[in-house]
Amino acid sequence: MGIKITMADKWFSLSIREAYDWTCCRCGTKYHHNHQGLDCSHGYSRGNWATRFSTLNARPACMGCHRIESGHWMERLLTDWERERLRELRDDVQLAKMYRKTKGKGELSKHWKQQYDLCLQARECGVTGVLPLEEWL
């Protein structure tokens, strides 16, 4: 059985894809809003709750690039400091327990829905490029 997709996963994924203007981070293909051909690629598996909702750990990737590159985009797109920070988060057992306790609901889900709504508002106002996202913690 695969990893269950929670409401927080849904809103986080939409936030990442909207923040990057529905553009694949590898090949640069731009997709229409809500297109199912663009995934939210996680550098470290969504099974790790400490990094599951980290913006450092996620980039949009089309299905083909996601399959080819998997999480290897981290080496290409993140700085040494960002990769080290992500490793620290990955190994933080207490953080993972705290995130897991939410079960991807409540405040966590609400936060990522708000981030998605803020991205949509920015796009409606004509803001282009990559949009900043605020981490939950």
Describe each region flagged by the PLM.
Residues 30-34, 46, 68:
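Cys/His-rich metal-chelating microdomains
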Residues 1-9, 134-137:
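Arg/Lys-rich, low-complexity, intrinsically disordered N-terminal tails that contact nucleic acids
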Residues 55, 68-137:
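A detector for short metal-coordination/catalytic motifs
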Residues 8-39, 62:
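Short cysteine-rich loop/turn motifs with clustered Cys
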Residues 22-25, 48-69:
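Short beta-strand-alpha-helix junction that forms the catalytic/metal-binding core
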Residues 2-6, 13, 48-51:
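Short, surface-exposed loop/turn motifs that are enriched in glycine and acidic residues
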Residues 36-45, 72-80:
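Short cysteine/histidine-rich zinc-coordinating motifs and their immediately flanking basic loops
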